[in-house]
Swiss-Prot record:
This is Acetylornithine deacetylase. GO terms for cellular component: cytoplasm. InterPro entries: AcOrn-deacetyl (IPR010169), ArgE/DapE_CS (IPR001261), Bact_exopeptidase_dim_dom (IPR036264), Peptidase_M20 (IPR002933), Peptidase_M20_dimer (IPR011650), Peptidase_M20A (IPR050072). It is found in: Cytoplasm. Gene3D superfamilies: 3.30.70.360, Zn peptidases (3.40.630.10). It comes from Moritella profunda. GO terms for biological process: L-arginine biosynthetic process. The keyword Transferase does not apply. Binds 2 Zn(2+) or Co(2+) ions per subunit. It is an enzyme of class 3 (hydrolase).
Amino acid sequence: MQLPKFNELYKSLILTPSISSLEKELDISNKPVIDLLAAWFSELGFSINITSVPETNGKFNLVATYGQGDGGLLLAGHTDTVPFDDGLWTKDPFQLTEKDDKWYGLGTIDMKGFFAFVLEACKNIDLTKLDKPLRILATADEETTMAGARAIAAAKSFRPDYAVIGEPTSMVPVFMHKGHMSEAIRITGRSGHSSDPANGINAIEIMHQVTGQLLQLQRKLKEQYACDHFVIPQPTLNFGHVHGGDSPNRICGSCELHIDMRPIPGVNPDELFMLLNQALLPIMKQWPGAVDVYHLHEPIPAYACDTDSALIKLAEKLTGETVIPVNYCTEAPFIHTGCDTIVMGPGSINQAHQPDEYLDLSAIKPTQAIIQKLIEQSCKN
């Protein structure tokens, strides 16, 4: 099989749905995309290792390796996309549509298209002249649980010198981002008839106490923690969603609040979760058994790469850009456990998760050149 042309690679990736979602009716296996990548990288001489991701709906990771041993470069990305709103897209999400010097399609920049760039770079390099191994990692479920990246981190099956995650950064290297925590506080009261409010335990009234304590925790985080690389330097706490009760004439028997917390580098998610529980401890003592705090999903740690890293210096030299921090999350905390890691890929983050997601065609040639040089300079002595 001859490797398809760049635009055909792109078309095939976009044509193959790989949506991940916590809603089961929307969740799709990524195996067809994994199989495409396996065939293409195998054609270029890479050895292929495909593994199932535990506790997922038919999801798989792929590691394609050219060379032997540790060291070298890892180019990483996720194969899944977010769901799409059919009413907001003006183009078919699963067709690569060219218009106004742009390629439209779901995953063009977030981030299946990155693999087409990597394949094109590998096609134009004499891989036999590389002195160090080149690995390609394609993961599952980044858009939901990051189960694929977590599985790779747990396996510890290889250790490159450097890793580049090809999320859309307009090819500006990213060296730091905050983490993400989604937490639930559930209040269980005792319902009853509203004509006698004292004859029950009103969960909304207890939640009122909870929000007061959390506002104090907000202030504490701002006063005691800071990372000046970020525009908002402190770990944040946001009230995102609350629901409780079912009727005006009933005492509210249950109420639930969902909050978002963003740890900064140096602050472990476990530490923030402990502070959250400590803030609510007085209410827990006042109302034994009424307050339950739990993760809506497993926390994602913050990430930071040492600015003295040779990888950062190389990325800055190749792109002409200075490394930056960002506020969104990636798989970097899990990849970074084994090597120096940056986030850098084609396309603007402003297009991610948006209707009519697109890649600006003017980015293609510069991006291909940067990725090719990155491979050559990272994998040669």
